[in-house]
Amino acid sequence: MCSGVSPVEQVAAGDMDDTAARFCVQKHSWDGLRSIIHGSRKSSGLIVSKAPHDFQFVQKPDESGPHSHRLYYLGMPYGSRENSLLYSEIPKKVRKEALLLLSWKQMLDHFQATPHHGVYSREEELLRERKRLGVFGITSYDFHSESGLFLFQASNSLFHCRDGGKNGFMVSPMKPLEIKTQCSGPRMDPKICPADPAFFSFINNSDLWVANIETGEERRLTFCHQGSAGVLDNPKSAGVATFVIQEEFDRFTGCWWCPTASWEGSEGLKTLRILYEEVDESEVEVIHVPSPALEERKTDSYRYPRTGSKNPKIALKLAELQTDHQGKIVSSCEKELVQPFSSLFPKVEYIARAGWTRDGKYAWAMFLDRPQQRLQLVLLPPALFIPAVESEAQRQAAARAVPKNVQPFVIYEEVTNVWINVHDIFHPFPQAEGQQDFCFLRANECKTGFCHLYRVTVELKTKDYDWTEPLSPTEDEFKCPIKEEVALTSGEWEVLSRHGSKIWVNEQTKLVYFQGTKDTPLEHHLYVVSYESAGEIVRLTTLGFSHSCSMSQSFDMFVSHYSSVSTPPCVHVYKLSGPDDDPLHKQPRFWASMMEAANCPPDYVPPEIFHFHTRADVQLYGMIYKPHTLQPGRKHPTVLFVYGGPQVQLVNNSFKGIKYLRLNTLASLGYAVVVIDGRGSCQRGLHFEGALKNQMGQVEIEDQVEGLQYVAEKYGFIDLSRVAIHGWSYGGFLSLMGLIHKPQVFKVAIAGAPVTVWMAYDTGYTERYMDVPENNQQGYEAGSVALHVEKLPNEPNRLLILHGFLDENVHFFHTNFLVSQLIRAGKPYQLQIYPNERHSIRCRESGEHYEVTLLHFLQEHL
């Protein structure tokens, strides 16, 4: 049996006997600390993340030309402060002995993409928050490879340009063309119609529109917005992902073009379709967050569903438009499901993902129930949608016209008693004509507790339905029998599926390329396996680094953005070569470099990764930044930097000198810095992450304290009487938990933007991990730090709270409520507010102030 008090607590409870062994951090003035931060930021500018991303390979058809591909991407050219559209030419031949550094070529001529003074519309600013975007300029683009059309948002407008396609490839930068509009307000989420690139869709004032790039014609397809600017008057939207869907499910769109068109009537009219989500938030609570225009004493209003309260009502609909030979829109029609969405799918709370099969025969969607423990993958034939009409008689007539064998198909189901981590990995194969079988690739975490790839074949069995009669579907009403399910990967490791991870499927060679952690949970690698005869898994990237890869459409090349804790990011292009009769074993050959690793700042010392076993025999990983002024026998003040929540992994073999540069700054001043991924962090399987289920804040600190004990014993320079705990968001929440439950371990806590009462956080996140409040009252109370302030220490200068006043994610209410409770309990605290910041600190001056505040608080009070 373990004793009630850990060795960490025993040592930390009293002062160290030998004060001479203490290393004391040199105290600097406020201006002195500012100079230190300026210096670290200046040197970090040399390695700041200017790496290219969002790659598109296009093969060049000229067999006699010197280049095989043109590679498009977003990047920040040298000397620029904003992202732009760039390209590089990939040569057909390279000299083995020479390092070929590809030049980054500007696609756009003298183009400023950032709005004047960096002022974005409210919609763009909030989307940047949800996507955690810090860069300016062009941050995304849509591309139609056959026509060479690029479409992107910039300077509060939309622009397009062409390269490749029938017009050939440009040789010098071009002026992008602005797409004029009659709409007021920003045009969000622009998408090219894959079946006819003359058309594109966009969202304006919460409604779905289409426009013709060539003629300028615009057509509003939905009519949810009532014309008033107020949130209260406009609860409905079409084609827009709500706050919770963006923030908690990583879905940033609510509309999807059908990839094919159909021709109808004697005039040969072309029909184009868009699947979209319609949302009604009229029963969702409205909250008021201070507006950036504070001097006007305004507030911004948001629909924000708090845990246990009502979510939006949702439905999937179709927008159809018919065009003539000149590309003129002849008509448009709004269609709804033959029976109400809530009747057909009564248990569905969230539409997690949606799209179309490549042949356009089916729309598909991933449906999730409210507890997020059951996911259904559903096919919806377009014939299941009928025109939205006012009269019941017309609706009945339209329903009667739907063939009886047209129905939804539930082709796959995932069920767990933990929670489902939503992801994008789904590849449907084209369905053979006249066949009932439907085959697809899917990643599933629920089967084994680790995310793996499966090839699934189902039979699309139909029943006869009278769609004029109300249907009360049974639990398995539309469920299709599974004929075959083959595991392509297996083991205690993960196929990467979250946060935008992709697979690339070569249907000619029957190979699937994916990223995973097969070799170590600390590194991401690119692998390939046959999906026809599942067997050997081949790794294509080099061990000792963590990689993020993009494959070419012809599967002959890939780009890897890779780094390690000691090597800043590189971006290299590789060519797969080998015999065509054995494509699985084609070897990657280094072809060219797009970016070489920059030199680290002279004072940068990479962290050291370690692992240890807890008393419960769970292996955990951590990393330590050793103090740069290390002297034998001296004990150093220590900062435990923590996140500790789900969906995040801090400890891995990737470069930390950009995002976490401040941890190196702390080490340069004489602090030891420790980071530990405890139970609840990701990339270790569902049950490791699921340790938090219904008990957030109750298991994480034990792992952190055991990690501190381990590093203190292993390294010998940790001063256990001078430990600070610091984190942001979930890390801010755990910093408070540490000081509440382990005040004898943590001398000070610095908590940034903490959730302090789970009852005030959103449905999608809180209920996934904590259930609804009525089912888990004890968990909610135990996990809400504001309800336990009496356990916080009575000594001043042990607690610092930081929060952005405009935070629309973890609302400032959390800090407000905590401070009220602290005052009521007579507890000391310090509070730093950032009046113009949201959940993440964006402004350079605010970021500098936060870092100086952190250093000053630590040097004075640790």
Swiss-Prot record:
Q: Where is the active site?
A: 729 (charge relay system), 807 (charge relay system), 839 (charge relay system)
Q: Where in the cell is it found?
A: Cytoplasm, Cytosol
Q: In which tissues is it expressed?
A: Detected in kidney, skin, brain, thymus and liver (at protein level).
Example of a GO MF term:
serine-type peptidase activity
Could you tell me the EC number(s) of this protein? 3.4.14.5
Q: Does the keyword Transcription apply?
A: no
Record note on what altering residue 729 to A does: Decreased levels of global dipeptidyl peptidase activity. Homozygous pups are born at the expected Mendelian rate and display no obvious morphological defects, but none survive to weaning
Q: Report which residue ranges the record marks as coiled coil.
A: none
Pfam families associated with the record: Dpp_8_9_N, DPPIV_N, Peptidase_S9
Q: Which reaction does it catalyse?
A: Release of an N-terminal dipeptide, Xaa-Yaa-|-Zaa-, from a polypeptide, preferentially when Yaa is Pro, provided Zaa is neither Pro nor hydroxyproline
Q: How is its activity regulated?
A: Inhibited by the serine proteinase inhibitor 4-(2-aminoethyl)benzenesulphonyl fluoride (AEBSF), and by di-isopropylfluorophosphate. Inhibited by Val-boroPro (Talabostat, PT-100), a non-selective inhibitor, which triggers pyroptosis in monocytes and macrophages. Val-boroPro inhibits activity by binding to the active site, mimicking a substrate-bound state, thereby displacing the C-terminal fragment of NLRP1, leading to activation of the NLRP1 inflammasome.
UniProt keyword list? Aminopeptidase, Cytoplasm, Hydrolase, Protease, Serine protease
Biological processes per GO annotation:
negative regulation of programmed cell death; proteolysis; pyroptotic inflammatory response
Is Repressor one of the keywords?
Answer: no
* Binding annotation for Val-boroPro: 729
**GO CC terms, sorted:** cell leading edge; cytosol; microtubule
Spell out the InterPro entries in the cross-references. Answer: AB_hydrolase_fold (IPR029058), Dpp_8/9_N (IPR045785), Peptidase_S9_cat (IPR001375), Peptidase_S9B_N (IPR002469), Serine_Prot_S9B/DPPIV (IPR050278)
Known function: Dipeptidyl peptidase that cleaves off N-terminal dipeptides from proteins having a Pro or Ala residue at position 2. Acts as a key inhibitor of caspase-1-dependent monocyte and macrophage pyroptosis in resting cells by preventing activation of NLRP1 and CARD8. Sequesters the cleaved C-terminal part of NLRP1 and CARD8, which respectively constitute the active part of the NLRP1 and CARD8 inflammasomes, in a ternary complex, thereby preventing their oligomerization and activation.
Describe, as the record does, how this protein assembles with itself and its partners. Answer: Homodimer. Forms a ternary complex with NLRP1, composed of a DPP9 homodimer, one full-length NLRP1 protein, and one cleaved C-terminus of NLRP1 (NACHT, LRR and PYD domains-containing protein 1, C-terminus). Forms a ternary complex with CARD8, composed of a DPP9 homodimer, one full-length NLRP1 protein, and one cleaved C-terminus of CARD8 (Caspase recruitment domain-containing protein 8, C-terminus). In the ternary complex, only one subunit of the DPP9 homodimer is bound to NLRP1 or CARD8.
The record's comment on protein family reads: Belongs to the peptidase S9B family. DPPIV subfamily.
Protein name per Swiss-Prot or TrEMBL: Dipeptidyl peptidase 9
Q: Which organism is it from?
A: Mus musculus
